Amino acid sequence: MVDAAVLEKLEAGFKKLEASDSKSLLKKYLTREVFDKLKTKKTPSFGSTLLDCIQSGLENHDSGVGIYAPDAEAYTVFADLFDPIIEDYHGGFKKTDKHPPKNFGDVDTLANLDPNGEYVISTRVRCGRSMQGYPFNPCLTEAQYKEMEQKVSTTLSSLEGELKGQFYPLTGMSKEVQQKLIDDHFLFKEGDRFLQAANACRFWPSGRGIYHNDNKTFLVWCNEEDHLRIISMQPGGDLGQVYRRLVHAVNEIEKRIPFSHDDRLGFLTFCPTNLGTTLRASVHIKLPKLAADRTKLEEVAGKFNLQVRGSTGEHTEAEGGVYDISNKRRMGLTEYDAVKEMNDGILELIKIEGSL
């Protein structure tokens, strides 16, 4: 049974959300009917409740989505809420749909988006992975955090060639190293209010760490929002090179760490927006003419399934006319197709900018 205090919190939170002018997907799909059906359910292995899934969205009415999965089973137990949100966010991925098997495609077919270096400042491709046998952030114990960090650190330390580098645990990290990594945009800070409210920051900084290779083009975040965020990036627009490095890294890590995967949803992540390929391919790009009107920029980007963010990440404004633009769709298509969609869209945006 779900205890009375949790039910009370749910009821109060639901009423507030209902009365709010929140634009979140949570508000859109959490009808009274769905709410009543799910409020007394729990996931079998970890006892996660509806509150664990939606408390961030109940607290932050300005959420875009407002829901997280406390453990892998939540996607099934609370499917009546997750499925419509997934379908809405991922461009019509229906509950009868199946995410295709992993396919990184032919990495050699992607080239430099901006060979003359006029528009693209940097290129980045990342994916998220969850380690099999562990729940997501809200259910992890401190001992599990430490055990996971140990596994990740050992695995990454054995990487060779271009991926060779060093693992820095957040615990006991000197202020200087910490600040340097933040300035490099490498380090993650303790979660924002959206993640805090989702209980994703417990036992901080235990079990959290960062790895980067010697030339700072390959990064792994351990236990930030997801168990693993694997990131390949470099200055300029050479998407082919960035993607090739990511694919190589993911394949190497997967040989040593089994990842959580679901036949229908693909690779499992804490936030439903990252499911499937989990892949986000992005550029920091200057498009001064298009960007003079952000609404117009977003409209054009939307046509190519691209998402526009401010240059310092989610929930931020653009600095100096530099935008972060990425593929929006991560589900129902292969890894290669997700990157290709971003590739084609960015080339179109550059073409439009050049013609203005």
UniProtKB/Swiss-Prot annotation:
Pfam families the UniProt entry points to: ATP-gua_Ptrans (PF00217), ATP-gua_PtransN (PF02807)
Gene3D superfamilies xrefs: ATP:guanido phosphotransferase, N-terminal domain, Glutamine synthetase/guanido kinase, catalytic domain
GO MF, one annotated term: arginine kinase activity
Keywords for the protein's UniProt record, in alphabetical order: ATP-binding, Kinase, Nucleotide-binding, Transferase
Statement: the UniProt record of this protein carries the keyword Ligase: no
Domain Phosphagen kinase C-terminal: 119-356
Single GO BP term: phosphocreatine biosynthetic process
Record-listed E.C. numbers: 2.7.3.3
Residues reported to bind ATP: 122-126, 185, 229, 280-284, 309-314
Binding sites annotated in the UniProt record for substrate: G64, V65, G66, I67, Y68, E225, C271, E314
Gene Ontology CC: one annotated term: extracellular space
Reactions the enzyme catalyzes: L-arginine + ATP = N(omega)-phospho-L-arginine + ADP + H(+)
Alphabetical list of InterPro entries matching this protein: ATP-guanido_PTrfase, ATP-guanido_PTrfase_AS, ATP-guanido_PTrfase_cat, ATP-guanido_PTrfase_N, ATP-guanido_PTrfase_N_sf, Gln_synth/guanido_kin_cat_dom
Sequence ranges assigned to domain Phosphagen kinase N-terminal in this UniProt record: 8-91
The family this protein is said to belong to: Belongs to the ATP:guanido phosphotransferase family.
Entry-linked PANTHER family: ARGININE KINASE 1-RELATED, ARGININE OR CREATINE KINASE
Name by which UniProt lists this protein: Arginine kinase
Gene: ARGK
